[in-house]
Amino acid sequence: MSPSPTPLWSPVGRAENGAVRLAYDRLQERADGEPLLVLTGLGANRLWIPDGFCRLLARRGFAVARYDQRDGGESTHLPPTATRNPVAALFRKRGEAYTAEDMADDAVAVMAALGWESAHLLGVSLGGAVAQRVALRHPRRVRTLTTMAAVPGDVHGLRTLCYIRTSTLARFARLRFPDTPEGAVEAGVAVSRLLASPRRPFDEAAAREAAGRNPDRGMHDQQAQSRQIGAQWHGPPIEALSRPTLVLHGEDDPLIKPGAGRVIARRVPGARLVLLPRVGHEIPEPAWDRIAAEVRALADTSAPGPAAARRD
């Protein structure tokens, strides 16, 4: 009898930040590599980060872990609040449930649970803004910062709207699917289609497979998304970022304007901007090699020194 194959991912772990429990897992391949934590986007759980992309990062020398943001996936979901629409949450003067600082501290709690003193960060969409805030709030815990398809980490509320394509938000608002596992899969496919580059054939089979692996309600749980997007930042501006920074943005991003990436790169000292051709608000397979190579090149510019090894 042949032995069972080794699972690709570790069993789900739970990190704690106060009353919030954060679900995370770790790629079993190259577990002895350089720590790299992947931060996910609005309404997306960790399973939306493609396995193949994570394995490619591992082959580049990284120990890859990912986690569900609070109010996403298997992490703690907070009680309902008055605001039920993510766009409406941008108009509020203060967040109703938690702060952006809380979300930054979540990432550090996951790192602590993994036993990592410091890590490279790769944040996508909302995760990119959270990653910037982690680097501002806990610079000694961050080796390098890669932000992809994100807005500047020090903006919130109405200031966010200047970076968002409102026509795409309107299309999201018109999506209607049953509140069932099957409806969640269809919602995931529809969202993936809206966020893909129009200059590349949409891979519906891949989108359906990804949605089928994680048919939770995140993609159409507007209350949870409202709490996430309503979390406000009270810390320093991104000009204070001191970690080596790479800014990635799809040239065809239909949700966050590429100008957002240009602003981040201009404002963060020493940051480098890479615009990805034929890429939308997504991590498509044709771009995996380029993204992984850029993250590796950034890491090679900053070997972990004493500052990176110390705790705050």
Model-based region annotation:
Residues L241, V247-H249:
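Short beta-strand/loop motif that positions the catalytic acidic residue
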Residues V20-L90:
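Conserved HGGG/HGGXW glycine-rich cap/lid loop of the alpha/beta-hydrolase fold
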Residues E101-A119:
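Conserved acidic catalytic loop of the alpha/beta-hydrolase fold
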Residues A271-D312:
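Catalytic active-site module of serine/aspartate enzymes centered on a nucleophile-bearing elbow/loop
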Residues S2-R21:
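N-terminal cap/lid segment of alpha/beta-hydrolase-fold proteins
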Residues D252-I256:
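Acidic catalytic loop of the alpha/beta-hydrolase fold
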Residues T160-P236, R243, V263:
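Alpha/beta-hydrolase
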Residues E117-R159:
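Conserved hydrolase catalytic core segment
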